[in-house]
Design a protein with these regions (language model features):
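Short acidic/polar alpha-helix capping motifs at helix-coil junctions
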Residues: 3-5, 55-56, 70-72
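Membrane-embedded catalytic scaffold of the fatty acid hydroxylase/desaturase
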Residues: 63-70, 74-123
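Loop-to-helix transition at the N-terminal end of transmembrane alpha-helices
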Residues: 50-61
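Aromatic-acidic/polar surface patches that form glycan- and anion
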Residues: 31, 59, 96
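Short hydrophobic "helix-edge" motifs at membrane interfaces and signal-peptide entry regions
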Residues: 22-23, 60-62
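Topogenic membrane-insertion module of multi-pass membrane proteins
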Residues: 1-52
Length: 123
């Protein structure tokens, strides 16, 4: 069996890529919500036509990415500010009908008991 592939990334580039920024986080989050609400409004306006179905499918796919956002916000890795991470996490949890405090601690428990049968809540 061959050893797993490990990408060689320049340490300076890696440091630059993982830096947190409130401005970049707000920009990316803002674009996400702008597109989400724009496609949502468009799908609502197309209700009753055949165009509703493909547009709503696009909306559902975009909405599904809120799960990835919730995961990264759980790790406080989107914004530099903890307050912005927490606020955005609450917003995303509200959108997906999840309780934010339970969600955060459940995910933390997952990382402390990863793949332990009966103890990993996400396993």
């Amino acid at each position: 069996m061959s050893p797993p592939f490990k990408a060689q990334v320049d340490p300076l580039l890696m440091k630059q890529l993982i830096q947190k920024s409130n401005q970049k986080g707000i920009l990316h989050f803002g674009i996400f919500f702008l597109v989400l609400f724009g496609v949502g409004i468009l799908s609502f306006q197309l209700l009753g036509t055949y165009w509703f179905f493909p547009v709503y499918l696009i909306y559902a796919i975009i909405f599904a990415f809120s799960e990835a956002a919730a995961h990264e916000l759980n790790h406080d890795s989107v914004f530099r500010s903890r307050w912005l991470n927490t606020s955005a996490h609450w917003l995303v949890c509200f959108m997906s009908w999840r309780e934010p405090i339970y969600s955060k601690y459940r995910h933390l428990r997952h990382h402390s008991k990863t793949s332990v049968i009966g103890e990993d809540p996400e396993g």
